[in-house]
Amino acid sequence: MKFIIKLFPEITIKSQSVRLRFIKILTGNIRNVLKHYDETLAVVRHWDNIEVRAKDEKQRLAIRDALTRIPGIHHILEVEDVPFTDMHDIFEKALVQYRDQLEGKTFCVRVKRRGKHDFSSIDVERYVGGGLNQHIESARVKLTNPDVTVHLEVEDDRLLLIKGRYEGIGGFPIGTQEDVLSLISGGFDSGVSSYMLMRRGCRVHYCFFNLGGAAHEIGVRQVAHYLWNRFGSSHRVRFVAINFEPVVGEILEKIDDGQMGVILKRMMVRAASKVAERYGVQALVTGEALGQVSSQTLTNLRLIDNVSDTLILRPLISYDKEHIINLARQIGTEDFARTMPEYCGVISKSPTVKAVKSKIEAEEEKFDFSILDKVVEEANNVDIREIAQQTEQEVVEVETVNGFGPNDVILDIRSVDEQEDKPLKVEGIDVVSLPFYKLSTKFGDLDQNRTWLLWCERGVMSRLQALYLREQGFNNVKVYRP
């Protein structure tokens, strides 16, 4: 099988040296992602496109899906590459390929041509279109808004019969821009802002401030791992967790009520800036949107920025909440965000929307900054690829099984779309479907006299959810890994 990768248009308008660098990086990213599916596949870069050739037909759908999620790709063409002799030969090959698709449909033919030939692209369109129209009685030509568009590409003596076109996410290849550190909370905003910087070519590391509760950190780990695995797995990234409970306690004890929100954000920026400096990261990323909450007015954002020289990027600054939620739905983080545990450790009764710098600084003089230094020093830094392994260690008390007993039920916790695409059927045992994002509210409704074997395709989500359910007091859960 063969795929032709078309570059994001902004890459094609770069200077020759920059364009070559971007294409080289994108080629490497594609190899890094696809080697998990087929180690023998070939990735070949050209000036206008990148070719992917693979032998394992069983991995065709998985490879195609992975390509649509790699930043820097505008669209993917799944093609059959065959030699040809003349225009009539092109027509005959197109007839074999497209006859069934065109029965009873309107169609047009669109051709792209590279190389030296004694015919033009329009000549091929007319000849092939006329031939298809004559040989398929139920089909008819319609040049505007046809039911089917027959895409052909002619390159020297090769004909590319395009079986399908699939849109990519666009943007720049990860690694073409410098690294950033995303302040991730697991909500709608931080997930979308992280994705937007990945799409723009940045390797995104994650910094999580735990304001209280292991369940929250488990949830945020899920989001970060999901984003990395889906859009950024071509690169290694860090997940840094900082226990911010001591900082919150100090703020609640010593800071004036109205200034708490702004000061908490200033402390987070200070801490994140130290982490960024430690690892050579150039900028912080937040999901703040102008006017969304009291700390996100222009005055307050300016005061928050003032505590650090590190650049703070806010890709969602002009977005409304509906737009952000729609983006979260598109990239697959909506369900995570909707079920994320909330820990509002600092809630002001009357938060200021226009903080005064002198008042903020006066309040911060009461704060013991050695507490902030200590939590940053003790921050837990892991390679995001190790989250699954670390979860295995943390859920030692949750048994992993590859078989089942008479009282067991398999609980398929994949998303609804995944369940519909690949239904799970295991002979000799009942299988119940309950998406992971409903476990926190619906698991208690299940028969607690049964033992529930949590299952997902890769085992990461099932282990994380098993840990969460055990913390909630459910001891009748195991992880199923056949």
Swiss-Prot record:
InterPro entries: Rhodanese-like_dom (IPR001763), Rhodanese-like_dom_sf (IPR036873), Rossmann-like_a/b/a_fold (IPR014729), ThiI_AANH (IPR020536), ThiI_fer (IPR054173), ThiI_N (IPR049961), THII_Thiazole_biosynth_dom (IPR026340), THUMP_dom (IPR004114). CDD domains: PPase_ThiI, RHOD, THUMP_ThiI. Its EC number is 2.8.1.4. It is an enzyme of class 2 (transferase). Residues 61-165 form the THUMP domain. GO terms for cellular component: cytosol. It is found in: Cytoplasm. The active site is at residue 456. It catalyses: [ThiI sulfur-carrier protein]-S-sulfanyl-L-cysteine + a uridine in tRNA + 2 reduced [2Fe-2S]-[ferredoxin] + ATP + H(+) = [ThiI sulfur-carrier protein]-L-cysteine + a 4-thiouridine in tRNA + 2 oxidized [2Fe-2S]-[ferredoxin] + AMP + diphosphate; [ThiS sulfur-carrier protein]-C-terminal Gly-Gly-AMP + S-sulfanyl-L-cysteinyl-[cysteine desulfurase] + AH2 = [ThiS sulfur-carrier protein]-C-terminal-Gly-aminoethanethioate + L-cysteinyl-[cysteine desulfurase] + A + AMP + 2 H(+). GO terms for molecular function: ATP binding; CCA tRNA nucleotidyltransferase activity; tRNA binding; tRNA-uracil-4 sulfurtransferase activity. SMART domains: THUMP. Disulfide bonds join 344-456. ATP binds at residues 183-184, 265, 287, 296. Pathway: Cofactor biosynthesis; thiamine diphosphate biosynthesis. NCBIfam families: ThiI_C_thiazole, tRNA uracil 4-sulfurtransferase ThiI. Belongs to the ThiI family. Catalyzes the ATP-dependent transfer of a sulfur to tRNA to produce 4-thiouridine in position 8 of tRNAs, which functions as a near-UV photosensor. Also catalyzes the transfer of sulfur to the sulfur carrier protein ThiS, forming ThiS-thiocarboxylate. This is a step in the synthesis of thiazole, in the thiamine biosynthesis pathway. The sulfur is donated as persulfide by IscS. This is tRNA sulfurtransferase.
